[in-house]
Amino acid sequence: MAVEDSTLQVVVRVRPPTPRELDSQRRPVVQVVDERVLVFNPEEPDGGFPGLKWGGTHDGPKKKGKDLTFVFDRVFGEAATQQDVFQHTTHSVLDSFLQGYNCSVFAYGATGAGKTHTMLGREGDPGIMYLTTVELYRRLEARQQEKHFEVLISYQEVYNEQIHDLLEPKGPLAIREDPDKGVVVQGLSFHQPASAEQLLEILTRGNRNRTQHPTDANATSSRSHAIFQIFVKQQDRVPGLTQAVQVAKMSLIDLAGSERASSTHAKGERLREGANINRSLLALINVLNALADAKGRKTHVPYRDSKLTRLLKDSLGGNCRTVMIAAISPSSLTYEDTYNTLKYADRAKEIRLSLKSNVTSLDCHISQYATICQQLQAEVAALRKKLQVYEGGGQPPPQDLPGSPKSGPPPEHQPCTPELPAGPRALQEESLGMEAQVERAMEGNSSDQEQSPEDEDEGPAEEVPTQMPEQNPTHALPESPRLTLQPKPVVGHFSARELDGDRSKQLALKVLCVAQRQYSLLQAANLLTPDMITEFETLQQLVQEEKIEPGAEALRTSGLARGAPLAQELCSESIPVPSPLCPEPPGYTGPVTRTMARRLSGPLHTLGIPPGPNCTPAQGSRWPMEKKRRRPSALEADSPMAPKRGTKRQRQSFLPCLRRGSLPDTQPSQGPSTPKGERASSPCHSPRVCPATVIKSRVPLGPSAMQNCSTPLALPTRDLNATFDLSEEPPSKPSFHECIGWDKIPQELSRLDQPFIPRAPVPLFTMKGPKPTSSLPGTSACKKKRVASSSVSHGRSRIARLPSSTLKRPAGPLVLPELPLSPLCPSNRRNGKDLIRVGRALSAGNGVTKVS
């Protein structure tokens, strides 16, 4: 236990003047300034009342100093009550007493100063001993359920330097020194009262046995020093193998007053009693002086000069919190006694005390273990019973907050629109709740999708947007304009009463309107990115599917048809790329970077989304093949890395796949639709979805990384002899508006003015427009010859974006044959006529032919 340093607390109480002092008509020598300051022998005011005698033969100011100021911890005036003194002395000490600290309160002063009145009181006005006992038992009863208490009391007096037991009167008792208990009185009786009333009865009986004799100074003068001690032993009620026991002692001491034989006119026995009283008080003063002068030095303290000081050894300078009550008289008749009392009280303030809680750990015997276990089990059972009562009676009913996500499936009439509170963190949490509702909606409509072939084609597309908010939750909230242009059908599913009860749905509709305006502003400023467009379409598709009830397939078809203007609007900024594999409506044709490809393919591959219905085993088996990389040449090792990230590599044509019948027949486009339908029905070779211009696809080159925004950038002139690393697999997701046939090639190429850059060392065609896809077989045989290529790519391909207003889309399909990579390749000789025909077409379209 840590040691706490403290000082002796000193309070001063000024008693009211007695009738004898009032009759003497002497001026008071004590003036109370405030609660802590008093002035001894203040200056006499000028112009006193006539007839009053302020002087005399024993007038103090003639011998002592004037106007002395004393500061104490507390000063009580003549009007102070017993309760006031108790509240500022023993009441605060009881807190430390119950924490295991020893405490002591003693009254010091001259005879007739009011010490016994302060400590004992009278019938109608009890003193500190009575009030302390009542307050102590009140606090013990308040802690009865937590701890077990035992109270012992003893009452003794020091009369003529002899110790007597006031509760069981007998002969003088000897005093002993115990190494563990300290100073003990041999043969002193200890009593254990059962209640506060019984303790007060014991105290009253002891006071009757105390020696009191009247003197000229005091009619009820105490001729002995009374010491009333209370011992409290407390320990926790929770049993254990080791228990902490606290034993504290409180001493309430009523000292006898110092007296002068000249004033008391004592003779015989009274004179001897007065001499012994003064002797013990003188020893007490010497102890106070020694303790005050110590200040950390090890000096001798004369405790053995008197039995009183031996009994008060631990209360004055030991492990005890001590309060000294100095009682004084305001009359000048006791001028010297009052001065001495104030002087010693002021000296006692410098006494420093070291406090330590008396806590002892006791180990229980092994024979008590069974009893301790039973007590612990009984306590656990009682606590469980209380807990059940509290939980049964005090549990608040669960509140259904409108913003909290529902754990059950959503109703049929409720659209899957999340509740969107304000704040970015709340928006991110709401996107997760939207995903859970979409998954439950997908499970509920799985039976309808199996019955309809159109739903089977759209099945994979419905699963893809379910996981899209996980890839970029910060962009999962904006929505396409088509979603918010139709708020009335969504609200129509609710009745008037449900709309009044669930305002969160109205809030969701307002947020969707805000998303519409954001989408329009971003599109007008050309700030839309492919991720944002995909997420807008994802949220649009989710809300549209939630609105469609089971069995309303006609509404779903019409809903997809209404999405055509939006798809055209989203794809109007990109150039359509012809390809022979365009069996589905067009989708997004913007550039897709590697980061976008990894973000799209990673989660879908992990989720195991099945391929589309058009996938064949022959095509699906080509994906697990290991990629074949071309060894870079010495010059290419020094080229910058940026152009390589946007290049592609051609391996072999996919026209033999058409001849083998592994791909479906090309059908003319019936009209544009949303990208979700196109993405669902496009050829897929694995659960992983790859964008159109990723390095593993076969579509023509897309714009560079600097052209991801819709506004074309003016790039500086770069080397056109760029080496492109194209994929060997067919595209997993064509992203074109329409399919163009062979008969439309001259017309289509005549409108394109972007330079076309094939691989060196073959004829280089500079043109406007995208690079035709490879369609001739046998290109894989030239792989070893292309390794020795010395062309270095120092620039990027510049493919201009034509505005949507100037772009005319042919209706027929366009199928371009694959250009030979080298004129020396024997496998390409049979296609010479096709090469010449394409070259003429390119020349007719303002193309420039260069032969290396």
Swiss-Prot record:
The answer to whether the entry has keyword Transcription is: no
Q: Name one GO molecular function term.
A: kinesin binding
SMART domains from the entry?
KISc
Domain of life of the organism encoding this protein: Eukaryota
Using the record's annotation, list all stretches that form the Kinesin motor domain.
Answer: 7-351
Task: Please note every region of biased composition (Acidic residues).
Answer: 451-461
Question: Which residue stretches belong to region Disordered?
Answer: 390-424, 437-485, 575-594, 602-689, 767-798
Provide the positions where the record notes the PTM Phosphothreonine.
Answer: 417, 674
Mark the residues carrying the PTM Phosphoserine. 404, 452, 480, 558, 633, 639, 662, 822
InterPro entries linked to this entry: Kinesin-like_fam, Kinesin_motor_CS, Kinesin_motor_dom, Kinesin_motor_dom_sf, P-loop_NTPase
Q: What tissues is it present in?
A: Shows a prominent expression in the amygdala.
Instruction: Point to the regions of Polar residues compositional bias.
Output: 664-673
Q: Which GO terms describe its biological process?
A: cell division; microtubule depolymerization; microtubule-based movement; mitotic cell cycle; mitotic sister chromatid segregation; regulation of cell division
Q: How does it assemble?
A: Interacts with MAPRE1; this interaction is required for efficient accumulation at microtubule plus ends. Interacts with KIF2C at microtubule tips; this interaction increases the affinity of both partners for microtubule plus ends and is required for robust microtubule depolymerization. KIF2C phosphorylation by AURKA or AURKB strongly reduces KIF18B-binding.
Q: What does this protein do?
A: In complex with KIF2C, constitutes the major microtubule plus-end depolymerizing activity in mitotic cells. Its major role may be to transport KIF2C and/or MAPRE1 along microtubules.
Family of this protein:
Belongs to the TRAFAC class myosin-kinesin ATPase superfamily. Kinesin family.
Q: What is this protein called?
A: Kinesin-like protein KIF18B
> Which species is this record about?
Homo sapiens
Q: What is the lineage of its organism?
A: Eukaryota, Metazoa, Chordata, Craniata, Vertebrata
